[in-house]
Amino acid sequence: MQTYQSGLARIEINNLSMRGYIGVLEDEMMYKQDLRISIALMYDAAQAISNNDVDVAVDYQRVVDALMPLVENERFALLERLAQDLLDRVMAFTTVRHARIKVERLLALRFTESVAVTLTGRRPCSPLCV
């Protein structure tokens, strides 16, 4: 018999490789830059777990599908702005309680693998949540 509360799930989408327009220099805005995006999100998966029901789970393919057009088609001067817009899209999934987005721009500086910005978002907790 289960004697603990379960159901808070953490989904991690690690090192999603994408190309997007990022930067302030003219050549940076003419050519897409290599980006690596990692997402961690938490949601209450108790119903999905107990019913083994994919329809009430967070579909991580839908999460990625929501992010791709933003990265591939929009232009950003700052990694911070791109990260915020990505976070907004993840938090648009109403069952997501908490999310962390890490956006890395590969080879942005000499002698580095990448430069990264990480942002987090959290929904306010209702009086009933633990």
Map each language-model feature to its residues:
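N-terminal, polar/charged subdomain of small-to-medium soluble alpha/beta proteins
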Residues: M1-V130
